[in-house]
Structure formats: structure tokens, C-alpha cells
């Protein structure tokens, strides 16, 4: 009985959501990830993200493999190129240190993919904290919470901009 309880506890730990990783170019998608950095689910937030996912089933895949596959699909489908070369990586985790570590790891992974494809890309990264306001904006505009957070930061610096005008833009266009 003791071993059975331990087995169930270990299974739950390996299959519980530990982090949420969001990737935004103009395709916006989100991945829930276990503490062992396995993808539990992938949610596309717009049609472009559905194109990127295609028929890929990334559930159970190592996070690095999933990120490589998604970046590869973005390159192949023209969402990332020499002209459109910025990607936003957002990480949400209750543990700030783990969030920062995962954010840096993913930035390094994506930079390696860019270098392998001879692409001069820009990886913007941030840690986000879930809030009802951000969730509502993300849902309203069909974007990730990470992109909603970036847009709020841009608007805070330039009050002449509006959320509605920035939401449909690519990360590359927002970063300019």
C-alpha cells in the first residue's frame, strides 16, 4: 500500500502543471509543462498558431524538443524569417527562481535554433504573473497572456498607443 501511494504521488507530480510557457511571434500559443519539463498540453490562441501546430501532438514531449519543433514550423511556414525575426518567450511559474531559470534556458535554446538556421533573431523574454485582467485581455484579443503583458508594458511607456491597435501586430512590429 505504501509503494502504491508513492507511485500515485510520483505520477501526479510528473503530470501536474508546474509552468506555463508562451511563445509569440504572431502565432500565439501556450504550453503547460510539468516539473520534469514535459509538455502536458499546447493551446493555440489564433489561426496562425493552429497552422504552426499542424498535426503535431507534442503532449509528453520534452520541452526542448517541443520548442525546437515549434520554432522549426514557424521558420518553415514563414512566420520567422530574416525580416520577421523576433519571438517573445513568456514563463509563468509560482517560483520566481524557477521561472527565471526556465526563461533563460528557453532563450538559449531558441538562440541555438536561430544560429543553426543562420537567422539573426531577437528573443525577448519575460516572466509573467497570472492576473484576471491579463487573462481577460488575452482571451478578448486571441493572444497569450505573455503578449498581453508585453502590450501593457508598451502602452505604459507610450499612452498614445492602444491595446486594440497593438494586439494584431507581430512581436517584431511591437518591438520596433
Predicted ranges, named:
Residues 1-17:
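Single-pass transmembrane signal-anchor helices and their membrane-water interface zones
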Residues 12-176:
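Polar, acidic low-complexity tracts enriched in Ser/Thr/Gln/Glu with frequent Gly/Pro and Thr-Pro motifs
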